[in-house]
Structures are given as structure tokens and as C-alpha cells.
Amino acid sequence: MDQVDLLSILTLGFVLGIKHAMEPDHVIAVSTIVCQSKKLWRSSLAGVFWGIGHTSTLLIFGMTIILMKKKISQEWSMSLEFLVGIILVYFGISAILSLKKTHEHSHSRLHLHTDHPIYTYKGIPYVKSLFIGIIHGLAGSAAMVLLTMSTVEKAWEGLLYILFFGAGTVLGMLSFTTLIGIPFTLSARKIRIHNAFIQITGFISTVFGIHYMYNLGVTEGLFKLWIR
């Protein structure tokens, strides 16, 4: 493969990475994290950390499978996808329940009669972003290997392809979390509107997660693979 062809393939990988970051299960999962942020830069970094987790996992597992010339079974691949559905439901419910905790903290603050603010936002949830990025990376490893092997010929070319693809996912999710973070940031001082956004995001994540698991388990036959 000459340099021009390789550059074209790497560019395509970068563009596909941006597109890949915009898949529904990706953006919905990260939205449940972004919706609880009140600073735009924190929203942006949530996307970056998702991309880091996603890319590092694809790189490690993808290259391991390519070098060992192995394949991930359909059952394992679908099971990892099913795990994504579980996390979507968990993150969705957690986002909704976070409103209850915020209300309880606000209520406690009124009874303390203190001028010192009580921060209900504990830490920056970069670990959550990194975690869901890793899970998404694991779930997408099988497809990534197939895409890489059908695109390039050598292992080092595969490494470059995954890196460019990963860079695209980081940029794609960074762009998305920055854009989606704007309404959450602007509504941070308007409690009712901000909480409504969180409730809607949590509800969408929960419903989509249930649909995602049902589709994998029933429609695509994962449950049958488990019990065969």
C-alpha cells in the first residue's frame, strides 16, 4: 500500500470515528453525565474522557485480536452490547435519582441556616465517562477488528487506522458534549428547567436502554444463545 492510499484510508478512518461517536447508545449514555454538569468545560471534558476510554480499549483489545488472529464470538460480542444496555438503564435511573438527592441537600441547607454553600455536585464524573467509554470500546471491538482487517493489510497499518479512528471518536464526542452542554450550562441557575432537562435525559436513557436490551435479547436472539 503506497502512502497516498494509506493517507486516504486513515482519513476515512478519522471521519468514520467522528460518525461512530454519534451513535445513539454513545450520545445517550454520555448525555446522562453531561446533564448533571453546570460548567461547559466539564461537559467538554466528559466527551474527551469517553473518547480516551473508548479508543484505548479498541487499541488494546483490537490489536491483541488482530495480532493473535483470533475472532470474538457472536455471543460474547452481543453480550458486551447487552452490558451497554444495562449501563444505559443504570445511568438513566441514577440521573433521575440525583434530583432527589439534590432536593434533600437543598432542604438540609435551609435548616442549617448557614451562609456557607453546600455543593451537591460531588466531584467531576470523568471516571463515569472513562468507564462507559471502555464498555463501548469492548462492545465495539469485534466490529472494529473486522473493519480494520478489511481496510488494511499489515498490523502496523491497523494500529494507525485504529488510532485515527479513535482520534475521530474523541473529536466527535468532544463536539457533541460541548454542544449538548450549552443548554444545561445556561439553565444551571434556573433549577426547574435544569431539573426538567435531567429528568428527560434520564428517562430517554432508561427507555432506550430497555429497548436496546430487548432488541439484542429477543429480536437478535441473544437469550437463545445464552440458554442453548
Swiss-Prot record:
It is a multi-pass membrane protein. Coiled coil: none annotated. The keyword Iron does not apply. InterPro entries: Chloro_ReproSupport/MetalTrans, UreH-like_TM_dom. The chain crosses the membrane at residues 48-68, 79-99, 130-150, 162-182, 196-216. The keyword Transmembrane helix applies. It is found in: Cell membrane. Its main location: membrane. Keywords: Cell membrane, Membrane, Nickel, Transmembrane, Transmembrane helix, Transport. GO terms for cellular component: plasma membrane. Belongs to the NiCoT transporter (TC 2.A.52) family. Probably facilitates nickel incorporation. May constitute a multicomponent high-affinity nickel transporter. Not essential for the expression of catalytically active urease. This is Urease accessory protein UreH.
